[in-house]
Amino acid sequence: MGKVKKKRGNTFNYNVDRKKLKRKARKKHAPRIPCETIRNAWNDGKSVAKNLAEMGLAADPNKCLPVRPSKVKDAEEQHSNVIKKPYVLEGLQALASLPSKQTMGISSDMIHYVRHMVENYGEDYKAMARDEKNYYQDTPKQIQRKVNLYKRHHPQDFQAMITSHVMQ
């Protein structure tokens, strides 16, 4: 006996361009390149190795820098190293030369600790090590490192503390 409701078979839509669909799907699922200079110079029609070679970057560092230098270089190898997109290299070098943002800060407890030590002892780290506020029993060298860290992050405050300590 047959089924009450007829099962529909798959139908093919002739009005859809399969080539465009495939290209769109491939582009959608491709990884997003985070670096803007490389992303703008990227050609989707070429392979990764060819794209990077045009930009002057190496896809495989082992092939770029051989272990043993070859004595005679082929003319073809030298000819293939022509950089077609030098602006990518310049952009990456400009990004690399920018100063990095300091992410590590100093906790408020450390600031109070260093201020207390410097206000009471100036730069006498051995006396700081014997202070009763030295809860963690830091050595003079460890205290000096903490003071130097505070100096780097708050140079004006540290200079004001030192001048006030000298005047007393």
Swiss-Prot record:
Where does this chain mainly localize? nucleus
**Alphabetical keyword list:** Nucleus
Q: Which residues form a coiled coil?
A: none
List localization entries. Answer: Nucleus, Nucleolus
Supply the InterPro entries for this chain.
Answer: Ribosome_biogenesis_Nop16 (IPR019002)
Q: Which GO terms describe its biological process?
A: ribosomal large subunit biogenesis
Instruction: Give a Gene Ontology cellular component term annotated to this protein.
Output: nucleolus
Question: One Pfam annotation, family name?
Answer: Nop16
Family per record: Belongs to the NOP16 family.
Q: What is this protein called?
A: Nucleolar protein 16
Its gene name is nop16
